[in-house]
Amino acid sequence: MKAITLLGSTGSIGTQTLDIVAQYPDQFRIVGLAAGRSLDKLIPQIRQFRPQIVALADEQQLDDLKAAIADLDPQPILVAGPAGVCEVAAYGDAKTVVTGIVGCAGLLPTIAAIKAGKDIALANKETLIAGGPVVLPLVEQYGVKLLPADSEHSAIFQCLQGVPAGGLRRILLTASGGAFRDWPVDKLGQVTIADALKHPNWSMGQKITVDSATLMNKGLEVIEAHYLFGLDYDHIEIIIHPQSIIHSLIEVQDTSVLAQLGWPDMRLPVLYAMSWPERIATDWPRLDLLKAGDLTFKEPDHAKYPCMKLAYAVGRAGGAMPAVLNAANEQAVALFLAERIAFLDIPRLIEQTCDRFSSKNCAEPSLEDILAADQWARQEVLLASQN
């Protein structure tokens, strides 16, 4: 039985992870849970999974949480705030920490888990995008495993099993095209929040669904793939695959192409990251290629999706620039979801912020440099959105 700690337990990845634990109680047990502020979801999770320790990022609700579970025996340790989330990440005998926290808020807890010797099931891509120059050396220093738990990078990781070192030539990241794949470019000025949140294939949280609509999600995944698999940006490509059946592909040195296929279900990559190197038998719906039908591909429209080109440029710039891109995107998407900017303002504000930072970029940023760049970018987007 593998001991698991889950960060971001009340979000989309978190709830699906707990579905897996509930379905396979002989395979996994929960050591710790960390959540943001959703007590209505967290309290039933605590009662069902009986973690040893629980963190609530929103410190103001800690007393309410204590009162709600006062009848439990034994009582879990309750901690709060960002420091509490880091404490949970490093706690106890958990073998693997599933990082389902959205955004750069997952960076410090992931580092805490690595330093405590935990393997990381990485569903929080922002940790690598913003913190790659710091996180990767720590992974090597502490001898832990970094296992991708999002569909595309899990697909690449699975395809690479058995490929010798140096055998990888090219990565092909598939993208559904998001909510606006069939919209003309000139209609994007009329986009509403409801429009942006209608993902055609996947059930995900709001932020990542908007990222899919701008294709920034795929741009961020290009940077993540660079850090995870070591390929340069000229050998990482994006292709539109509307059916989301092929989750990504690799080309090896002899030009053979390997792909991983499955229904669009986030539980699959999460389960593989939790159970690797084992394969757990499930009763989930099996892929029927006749039912799936035609599998089609096309080149992404760069006029419709300017965030892709921007992400490639930022990735090549390196240093702290990816942290700026990520933070600017997080802030711009939050403003859009709060109805304070329009959809087309998202790429405009991100590009402006990255341009302003380019002269400040440093090639080998420290953790402090990355966190400072993150805060600077958020403030820049806020200020620019008011003009």
Curated annotation (Swiss-Prot):
Query: Does this UniProt record's set of keywords contain NADP?
Result: yes
Reactions the enzyme catalyzes: 2-C-methyl-D-erythritol 4-phosphate + NADP(+) = 1-deoxy-D-xylulose 5-phosphate + NADPH + H(+)
Please provide, alphabetically and separated by semicolons, the GO molecular function terms listed in this UniProt record.
1-deoxy-D-xylulose-5-phosphate reductoisomerase activity; manganese ion binding; NADPH binding
Q: Which cofactor does it need?
A: Mg(2+); Mn(2+)
Q: What Enzyme Commission number does this protein have?
A: 1.1.1.267
Write out the residues that bind 1-deoxy-D-xylulose 5-phosphate.
125, 151-152, 176, 199, 212, 217-218, 221
Name of the featured protein: 1-deoxy-D-xylulose 5-phosphate reductoisomerase
From the broadest rank down, the organism's phylogenetic lineage runs: Bacteria, Bacillati, Cyanobacteriota, Cyanophyceae, Gomontiellales
- The UniProt gene name for this protein comes to dxr
